[in-house]
Amino acid sequence: MKLTCMMIAAVLFLTTWTFVTADDSRYGLKNLFPKARHEMKNPEASKLNKREGCSSGGTFCGIHPGLCCSEFCFLWCITFID
């Protein structure tokens, strides 16, 4: 019984926390879908395609692939040519 009450309280708390910390819980999904549709029509509009501060091929990256524009890192950034 205590476990059931604790589970219900935890679910209610997490649900409330999600709505409180959301940017716009009232119109969040309404504004999300038109933007996604616009980005599908124009893939250049996507912010995910832009990589700022990344290293080009041949520069030292250690073991962190996030530093390379190509996302391939083996001590140096690797760029594949098609």
From Swiss-Prot:
Protein localization: Secreted
Propeptide residues per the UniProt entry: 23-51
UniProt GO MF annotations: calcium channel regulator activity; sodium channel inhibitor activity; toxin activity
One cellular component term from this protein's GO annotations in UniProt: host cell presynaptic membrane
Keyword Manganese: no
Residues annotated as signal peptide: 1-22
S-S bridge residues: C54-C69, C61-C73, C68-C77
Keyword tags: Calcium channel impairing toxin, Cleavage on pair of basic residues, Disulfide bond, Ion channel impairing toxin, Knottin, Neurotoxin, Presynaptic neurotoxin, Secreted, Signal, Toxin, Voltage-gated calcium channel impairing toxin
Keyword GTP-binding: no
Main location per the UniProt record: secreted
Pfam family, one: Conotoxin
Tissue expression: Expressed by the venom duct.
InterPro entries: Conotoxin (IPR004214), Conotoxin_d-typ_CS (IPR012322), Conotoxin_omega-typ_CS (IPR012321)
Coiled coil: none
Entry text on domains: The presence of a 'disulfide through disulfide knot' structurally defines this protein as a knottin. The cysteine framework is VI/VII (C-C-CC-C-C).
Main function: Omega-conotoxins act at presynaptic membranes, they bind and block voltage-gated calcium channels (Cav).
Family membership noted in the UniProt record: Belongs to the conotoxin O1 superfamily.
Protein name: Omega-conotoxin-like 9
Protein species of origin: Conus striatus (Striated cone)
